[in-house]
Amino acid sequence: MHQPKKRLAKKSWAFLTAALTLGVITGVGGYFLFNQNKQRSSVSNFAYQPKQLSVKHQQAVDETLTPWTWNNNNFSSLKITGENPGSFGLVRSQNDNLNISSVTKNSSDDNLKYLNAVEKYLDGQQNFAIRRYDNNGRALYDINLAKMENPSTVQRGLNGEPIFDPFKGFGLTGNAPTDWNEIKGKVPVEVVQSPHSPNLYFVLLVPKVALEYHNLNNQVVKESLEVKATQSSFNPTQRLQKDSPVKDSSKQGEKLSETTASSMSSGMATSTRAKALKVEVERGSQSDSLLKNDFAKKPLKHKNSSGEVKLEAEKEFTEAWKPLLTTDQIAREKGMGATVVSFYDAPYSENHTAFGLVDHIDPKKMVENYPPSWKTPKWNHHGIWDYNARNLLLQTTGFFNPRRHPEWFDEGQAKADNTSPGFKVGDTDHKKDGFKKNSSSPIALPFEAYFANIGNMVAIGNSVFIFGGNGHATKMFTTNPLSIGVFRIKYTDNFSKSSVTGWPYAVLFGGLINPQTNGLKDLPLGTNRWFEYVPRMAVSGVKWVGNQLVLAGTLTMGDTATVPRLKYDQLEKHLNLVAQGQGLLREDLQIFTPYGWANRPDIPVGAWLQDEMGSKFGPHYFLNNPDIQDNVNNDTVEALISSYKNTDKLKHVYPYRYSGLYAWQLFNWSNKLTNTPLSANFVNENSYAPNSLFAAILNEDLLTGLSDKIFYGKENEFAENEADRFNQLLSLNPNPNTNWARYLNVVQRFTTGPNLDSSTFDQFLDFLPWIGNGKPFSNSPSPSTSASSSTPLPTFSNINVGVKSMITQHLNKENTRWVFIPNFSPDIWTGAGYRVQSANQKNGIPFEQVKPSNNSTPFDPNSDDNKVTPSGGSSKPTTYPALPNSISPTSDWINALTFTNKNNPQRNQLLLRSLLGTIPVLINKSGDSNDQFNKDSEQKWDKTETNEGNLPGFGEVNGLYNAALLHTYGFFGTNTNSTDPKIGFKADSSSSSSSTLVGSGLNWTSQDVGNLVVINDTSFGFQLGGWFITFTDFIRPRTGYLGITLSSLQDQTIIWADQPWTSFKGSYLDSDGTPKSLWDPTALKSLPNSSTTYDTNPTLSPSFQLYQPNKVKAYQTTNTYNKLIEPVDATSAATNMTSLLKLLTTKNIKAKLGKGTASSQGNNNGGGVSQTINTITTTGNISEGLKEETSIQAETLKKFFDSKQNNKSEIGIGDSTFTKMDGKLTGVVSTPLVNLINGQGATSDSDTEKISFKPGNQIDFNRLFTLPVTELFDPNTMFVYDQYVPLLVNLPSGFDQASIRLKVISYSVENQTLGVRLEFKDPQTQQFIPVLNASSTGPQTVFQPFNQWADYVLPLIVTVPIVVIILSVTLGLTIGIPMHRNKKALQAGFDLSNKKVDVLTKAVGSVFKEIINRTGISNAPKKLKQATPTKPTPKTPPKPPVKQ
């Protein structure tokens, strides 16, 4: 506690310091003892001194704890409404000496033992608390569970209601909450307030190891991620190995027959369909087996041996990825899971904190409600289990299997082998015994996926929901955990009992497909009755927008791509059903052939185009020949596979069938707000990363009323044996009363895609920067690591960069728009090489020079200045005069890349994914060496390797993002050779090569969602990668349509980092109502490079771009983007690989980013902190700032106070600004520091008006106490009745009494004593603000509070009257009270009796001193000048109290 000045009674500090740390007193308050019996005029000393609190806080406020947020959720602080308004915020200690590696893991220890040891170590190293603030932003006290001496649960009455007295506080049982020892060391990451009681709160706790996941021992986490420094033969990107199968012509067991048009349903249009193959599956005499022509017989040989299948974790693959803990371990070990604790808090009471219930978020509660199909072995994605050929496509349980999505399986990849396939193994005939009821590897919720799901807690009614996090808590390179569902804790009406349940999104938001009714019952996710799709989300947040509850984020739906449960003759009858996505995708149309299972090469794509009966944008199926697809050659896409054999430990791309012949399914994007669900036919498999925007209004009443247990029927289960399962029919007319129908109204409105028209997307709608030219490094096909060879340096295809050089040929085409943001000048680059305007101008070409309206000399791609020619080589064209007219054989794709059709949903999807960097694309070249990509005629689509064809294969490669591919195929490590494809460049290993791997340059994953920002009552938005996405008028849409705007900043900087998401610090609403985002590159982490001790080969990968505000509107030659990656000499071939690596070393990158060295970081030279606002820095006196003599911008202040988004608005409280986030970020003050009266400073009124408590000798006790003391105030509101207020307070003439009130804090009927608190009304919000006071020596000092407060809570006095100045610095808690709107209240001075002090300089100086101490603002003023010349030499301010 603090040591007060001597003339203050020590006890009078007891409550004061417990209640205040940072804030300003805006008036005076008094606590008086009135004793009717003694009839004397003096008043006893009465400072509010709570007794020894039963719930004891070690320190009222621990000044070493600073604000922070968890990177997995949307929470920064909670605004509290109700009886004692204010807020809760998260605070933590900053320990730079944390060394988790000091906790050793013995080889005999399991993960749980190790995690417990880490947790114990962290207990002594870190402190976490929630901090209670009052309505002025003053910190009252910290609730630190770990330091509570005797925590107690609340006493309850007969009906279970908590016992509470406004003065004494909560009744306490003396008993600690349930499992206190397990939960007291956990970290609070979110707090919500109950809508039922202003004093009831819920805190979400997670173990410390979840926060430190990325820092755990690499034997635990890194090993799980298969990043090993020692074993060079191990390749983390490969996970478990597969062999390429080859055709087995000896197998002819399939019964194949042609179907003719006459066998098709007469009601179906046949003009667009070719003949399909009929496949029958016959059951043997035994119902659980198939006939001897069993499809499961091995139809494919393997390269190594005919029977061996290498799928187990053996031989050189010694490690399979495993989650940190299994579902059972989390459920059993309560200290290792998340917990929600209810607690009661009333800050102005004696016992002000008491605990309620403790609920552990048991992952099994979610798993129990998984659909039965998630627990049963599914067919492999060719439709049938096949033990011997299972490694063909690494299938185990459908597409959502442990090999592709190990985060959701308890054994990770360890079960992704042939040990427990669910049927007998070892039978030579491989007969099936039928399927086990439960798979050995059901979908579960182990550590990584579980903590991805913990976040965004909301209290609705008598329930608390955890809607899911954004996945960053446990996100690493080889894992992409996402939220899979919603947890709910349901309480009884008096919150005395509770129950936990969980629902997967698949059921909560899923509607059954019914082709007869256009199927989707207005729900976001279309599914089938087996719930074979596993939707997952990166949740941005769940917030109240206006009066609606909105969930927003990004979503992947995914599918299992299993064959339909129809015989093929039925399939033929129901082609429309097939096309509508009844469990069908590209792979579903694979026919059983002697070649194995594959799409028939002789079925034209047109066979699957739909007629008018189908969906407008149905799926289209491309040629898919297994001989090409799975037995690729080195000079085609085999380069993509073979390159995984290198040992670069950070190559974290998991290869999966990179095929030049892959079809690419798209979401049906729409700007409609209703009935445009994500149905299976638009989903690209169960991709890793989210690939659609998603926002929905939820029905909170239905959510609170749903049952704990979901009951599935027999219809939701697969048939019990394989033959029956293969022929299991779909329900074409599902019963409307199916057991999940009750969920149909959970979502009231949703959107799954943007209206891109007239958005900022239009600035590059027409040309995506993803067409690379022929070579990996400019025109050189052979990058080399030898110092003697020379290789030109690469450029990056990027947004506003990589625009086609021959752009003028396209700009005037019909329907093509090129809309730039104002004053925007992109550089004209291509992926082919560094673009120079001339030999002397090496900084790119301004857009103005290539616009069609410009008469200047057009850019000449044939000029030698615009080529990068290897020494001794011949120059080749590096730009493309025209994009291909067609990129696919289907009509819907014709404009998909040239983007002249604005309403093309595929185009929209392509565009978003290209912005997010999630589209690696293989494009096969066509033509000979003279016109490889220049063909402007229709390319043939049935050729794969020859010059006369160009069949682009659009393969989204399972949602992998370009950062991974850039790293894997980029310029890193020792295996840089001619066979490594380079992202965005031609993978040209030989003249016969025909594949180019192309990708966009904005390298974000769509998992990189920021926190949800409420912009107004109908709009909201969040940061997605480098873009801020605004959902405009979502709550009250205009004519049923939604406007989604994507806005970025104009200046770009490439950041090279392993974990780019660590740099994003959050978005908030600026004072002018504009959403802004905050970045801190100093928070970027890189994985250690253990293979080298020096910084030659950087360990950082180009993972994302950081946008910074462009403060110069004109085109700038010093563009930071150019400078960061600009080659040393762009026109010379002299620089080689070494130069590039040198250029990209961590040290150089840091220098480019302005991060500097450790010494310069201290004074924040550059600091590496980038904001989207100009920070208000205080380099001088406050009043100077208002005169614009310093960097405080008066206009900003004016805008703030004039705007409707004032600092008391609903949106601002702590949800926005991030101050000293992790100890490295400099203080960001987003609210103005001061506001003097009308911006002018002091008034010069000579008459002193006073508002003060009357001294005892002026109080009419005879009038006051003719009645019992309880008659003086309203027992319900505890406010002194209006008629008695003037008897206690001196009010100036003409003063509006309605602007103050007296709140009763304590009273005694026995002694006839009364304690009151004076509260002022904030004229802007009309809320009353309590003003605390520390009176110590009677009425004479009650009115001289200024020398009794700690220095840093002094108000400013400018002569007389007093002007109250509000300083707001903590947590962005928007503390300001612009009382100047109420002139009379402000001009009412305080009676200083016999003291006149000039406290202006003292107040300002000491306040700023304290702010500096508390927030670490390094550029705070060195000296504060006086605002008025009345006292040239200020008195030395008393020293603030020091800790004992």
Swiss-Prot record:
Residues 258-272 have a biased composition (Low complexity). Residues 851-860, 868-878 have a biased composition (Polar residues). One of its GO terms (cellular component) is plasma membrane. Keywords: Cell membrane, Cytadherence, Membrane, Signal, Transmembrane, Transmembrane helix. It is found in: Cell membrane. The chain crosses the membrane at residues 1353-1373. Residues 231-283, 845-885, 927-949, 1419-1444 are annotated as: Disordered. Residues 1431-1444 have a biased composition (Pro residues). Pfam families: Adhesin_P1_C, P1_N. Residues 240-257, 933-946 have a biased composition (Basic and acidic residues). One of its GO terms (biological process) is adhesion of symbiont to microvasculature. It is a single-pass type I membrane protein. Residues 1-30 form the signal peptide. The protein is the major adhesin mediating the attachment of this mycoplasma to the ciliated epithelium. Belongs to the adhesin P1 family. This is Adhesin P1. It comes from Mycoplasma genitalium (strain ATCC 33530 / DSM 19775 / NCTC 10195 / G37) (Mycoplasmoides genitalium). The gene is mgpA.
